[in-house]
């Protein structure tokens, strides 16, 4: 076999055969075959960056950029909020456009709804921080190996997963599509703790160790609850029961 007058080696022929087979497979019009998704879907890397910046807002004394000193907390917070709100707004807008139920909506809907949801989320941040403060206290009280609250914020995977979930839960409740799941699955990949953003979790929540914990969407957890590694809290389907 030759291409452009040049004889192909055996491995080149095999590669061309594989390519032909794959191109044919792409034409089957299945969900996994979509070609027009790039640029139209939420960006996981950008959402991860939003999480990192939200940690700077939730815990201003722990995750700030150390390359410069903050002389005016109000100015610093203003710049950070404006930056994160813009980035979140863009990702929410993309997620709304990507959702099948919105395919008939006008462009103005996506602009207005993304702005409304972004503002609504940021207004909830003081409430989220109030919950996180109780979670921090629960971890400190519940773990005799925790000598300082600082180490819980900086080092505990369970506290990281809880923080991400508190953020994602508010977005989920507001009706933001996809982004809450991307956030919690990012935390899951880092910590081994899988919390669905739809789960309802009360104050003073502590995850000890944490690896292998699964908390499903329908789960409701009250206040002052401590969960150890390897625990599953979810509703099984009748087929799985």
Indicate where each model-derived feature is located.
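Terminal amphipathic alpha-helical/low-complexity segments used for targeting or macromolecular assembly
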Residues: 1-182
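Generic structural "secondary-structure junction" signal
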Residues: 154-156, 197, 235
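A short glycine-/small-residue-rich loop at the edge of a beta-strand within enzyme catalytic domains
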Residues: 158, 174, 178, 196, ...
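Double-stranded beta-helix
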Residues: 167, 185, 232-234
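Membrane-interfacial amphipathic helices and adjacent loop/beta segments
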Residues: 177-180, 184-193
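A structural motif detector for beta-strand N-caps
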Residues: 187, 193, 199-207, 211-213, ...
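Conserved small/polar residues in nucleotide/adenosyl-binding loops
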Residues: 236-241
